[in-house]
Amino acid sequence: MIHSQKERRYRCKRCGRTFTETKDTAFYRMHKPRWLMLAVMTLLSYSCPVQAIVVAFDVDERTVARWQRESGSQCRRVHEHLVEAGKVALLQVQADEIRVKAVGGVFWLASAMEVRSRLWLGSVISQHRDGRLIGGLLIRVRACGPVEKILLVTDGLSSYSSQALKIFREALHTGKVGRPRLGLGTGVMIARVIKRYQRRRVVEVMRRVVTGSEAEVISRVIATQRSMLALINTAYIERLQATFRARLAPLVRRTRAGAHKHSTLEGGMWLVGSCYNLLWAHRSLGEERTPAMAAGLTDHRWSMEELLTFAVPPAELPRWRGRKPKWLLEAEDAA
């Protein structure tokens, strides 16, 4: 229900409260022209340093940082609504991490992608390269789709195998009384690519199958990469990481625009990742298709304005056994 056309406000028919048109979007409570924020976000997604934007548009650097954080939050909501809805066919998933040099510290950025559609499944940032980082990444991978027939290809970091064996487990129902035992499905496969370096050069590449048969792993790799000469590799995720380094200024190896805060790096990560999935056409997919189009998540190529103004529907109310709390009763009345 329209409340005010001049102020672009609406009134909810159920709760009776008014809200603005830009509620729960990146433009909420923004007092600058919309074109300015769209231009700034486009430049940030193409690795433009913040100081250059400050000089070009006469905008305070704190304003640019706040816009990047809000746009990153919007992109994260869109990613969780579209990609992590459980509809992606996870045939071959490659995962890897990169070292990010920040101001006064170091961050680790772990990412994963689906090879067949080139879809970015998400990333996790942490100060330590440990099992918690890898576990958070694999939790996002599992939210993207079923893992009954997944092939996970990683580098030599042992945390991937241990965390995958823990997170990809499912209940094995036997028909007996009691809680079913947790275990991996018969279609789950895990492979590792271990590279040995000497004087900063790769001198040997070892390929190992952790879970599953080698014949099934090779067959899956050939089917997803569409090449009879394909071997177990992490080339696709490494190419994606190169895209992130080229499109996000703080990820450049020798940069003067290093990130000072975790939130700045995370906001830029979600912005670039969502642009990669929804805005940028991938050359290997052909016909001006984006990875989200190849995965069947959308039928057109998005624009920056559509990404930042997309209204994500609210989450469903949780099921509650017993007496419901006050906040849940108020939410049910409003819904």
Task: Locate the predicted segments by residue.
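Residue-level recognition of single "structural anchor" positions
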Residues: 1-335
